[in-house]
UniProtKB/Swiss-Prot annotation:
<dbReference type="GO" id="GO:0035269">
    <property type="term" value="P:protein O-linked mannosylation"/>
</dbReference>
<dbReference type="GO" id="GO:0006487">
    <property type="term" value="P:protein N-linked glycosylation"/>
</dbReference>
<dbReference type="GO" id="GO:0000139">
    <property type="term" value="C:Golgi membrane"/>
</dbReference>
<feature type="compositionally biased region" description="Basic and acidic residues">
    <location>
        <begin position="30"/>
        <end position="42"/>
    </location>
</feature>
<comment type="function">
    <text>Phosphatidylinositol-4-phosphate-binding protein that links Golgi membranes to the cytoskeleton and may participate in the tensile force required for vesicle budding from the Golgi. Thereby, may play a role in Golgi membrane trafficking and could indirectly give its flattened shape to the Golgi apparatus. May also bind to the coatomer to regulate Golgi membrane trafficking. May play a role in anterograde transport from the Golgi to the plasma membrane and regulate secretion.</text>
</comment>
<feature type="region of interest" description="Beta-hairpin required for oligomerization">
    <location>
        <begin position="183"/>
        <end position="194"/>
    </location>
</feature>
<dbReference type="GO" id="GO:0045053">
    <property type="term" value="P:protein retention in Golgi apparatus"/>
</dbReference>
<keyword id="KW-0333">Golgi apparatus</keyword>
<keyword id="KW-0813">Transport</keyword>
<feature type="binding site">
    <location>
        <position position="83"/>
    </location>
    <ligand>
        <name>a 1,2-diacyl-sn-glycero-3-phospho-(1D-myo-inositol 4-phosphate)</name>
    </ligand>
</feature>
<dbReference type="GO" id="GO:0019899">
    <property type="term" value="F:enzyme binding"/>
</dbReference>
<keyword id="KW-0446">Lipid-binding</keyword>
<feature type="binding site">
    <location>
        <position position="167"/>
    </location>
    <ligand>
        <name>a 1,2-diacyl-sn-glycero-3-phospho-(1D-myo-inositol 4-phosphate)</name>
    </ligand>
</feature>
<protein>
    <recommendedName>
        <fullName>Vacuolar protein sorting-associated protein 74</fullName>
    </recommendedName>
</protein>
<keyword id="KW-0472">Membrane</keyword>
<feature type="binding site">
    <location>
        <position position="164"/>
    </location>
    <ligand>
        <name>a 1,2-diacyl-sn-glycero-3-phospho-(1D-myo-inositol 4-phosphate)</name>
    </ligand>
</feature>
<feature type="region of interest" description="Disordered">
    <location>
        <begin position="1"/>
        <end position="42"/>
    </location>
</feature>
Length: 331
């Protein structure tokens, strides 16, 4: 089955940071009226297996200009890539998985059906909104969901599946988490909100985590309060971050501080990871030709051993990375 994206007209305010204000759903509005004790919120607070920042927030942060507080207007990839990040995040949190059908191996990883297996809230508004949409739908393929969440469909019966104002909502979430701040700036006679970086140490720690995989011979992750050592799938998360940043055309910003040779080898390693992890089972027996992060395969295998019963969840990750590997053809 060929992999195609179909475009429909979207309003300019749907995606640009600083666009039109968010229209909250009734459910989201209701979240502002909190009861004294919510067992589900208590469970979320006690859960140390998830990082403070989602994969989508990390990718957006890598693309933002630190002082200006907005993304490059020329970046056409990031909106679509962020929808893939949503699917990866839901899969790593155990909410969705590939439908367990023996016939699925006949199809490309991106063309395999996915289903909701845990409909409980994550505490992240965008993830929960996507999860609600998926719960109310028949199983669709990974690339179908990326198209629908992006509004890239000719099926007008499913146009309401589009997640709107994703970049602006992610930026506001980072403001709430103390990573960004909001400033009003003038663009062509209009005042619009921008979100400069408030906590540079957070962004720098994410960059260091990426570079720890793309530069040295051996991986050694550095942990922070926002990304503690207790996080589940910390190596797979970092690989997904690198591949998502590559697909979103923001990886270059991370590698720009390196000299030419290291930058070139870093890109080569990122592309090597994209090929290796866009199939399932992951190609952990593949020789690492770049000679970078040579211990990564072993570390990932140890993660898989510590998390049995997650194969169908991780197959979603592989399917999204497969879409990223074809981004140049899609756009």
């Amino acid at each position: 089955m060929s992999l195609q994206r179909r475009r429909v007209n979207k309003t300019a305010g749907n995606e640009t940071v600083g666009g039109a204000s968010l229209n909250r759903s009734d459910e989201e509005e209701g979240m502002t009226h909190k009861v004294a004790y919510d067992p589900e919120e208590q469970k979320l607070r006690e859960n140390t297996r998830e990082p403070t920042l989602t994969l989508m927030e990390e990718v957006l942060l890598m693309g933002l200009k630190d002082k200006e507080g907005y993304l490059s207007f020329l970046n056409e990839n990031i909106s679509y890539a962020l929808r893939g990040c949503i699917l990866i995040e839901l899969a790593l949190r155990g909410r969705i998985q590939v439908v367990d059908d023996a016939m699925r191996r006949r199809f490309d990883p991106s063309e395999r059906l996915i289903e909701v297996v845990d409909g409980s809230k994550t505490g992240e508004a965008l993830l929960d909104e996507a999860l609600t949409l998926m719960k109310g739908s028949e199983p669709l393929t990974i690339v179908n969901w990326m198209d629908l969440l992006s509004g890239e469909t000719w099926n007008f019966l499913k146009i309401n599946y589009q997640l709107r104002q994703v970049r602006e909502r992610l930026a506001k979430g980072l403001v709430d988490k103390g990573v960004l701040r909001t400033e009003m700036k003038n663009f062509f006679l209009f005042d619009m909100p921008t979100h400069p970086v408030a906590d540079t140490s957070c962004k720098e720690s994410i960059k260091r985590r990426i570079l720890s995989v793309l530069v040295p011979r051996n991986v050694e992750l550095q942990y922070t309060e926002l990304f503690p050592e207790t996080v589940a799938f910390k190596y797979l998360r970092t690989i997904a971050l690198i591949c998502s940043a590559h697909g979103a055309n923001v990886l270059e910003k991370v590698l720009s501080t390196l000299d030419y040779e290291k930058r070139d080898r870093g890109f080569s390693r990122a592309e090597e990871l994209l090929v290796q992890f866009s199939q399932y089972p992951f190609a952990l027996d593949k020789d690492i030709e770049t000679g970078i992060s040579v211990n990564l395969n072993r570390l990932v295998q140890e993660e898989l051993d510590r998390n049995p019963g997650t194969a169908l969840n991780l197959e979603v990750v592989a399917g999204v990375l497969k879409v990223y590997s074809r981004m140049d053809d899609l756009l």
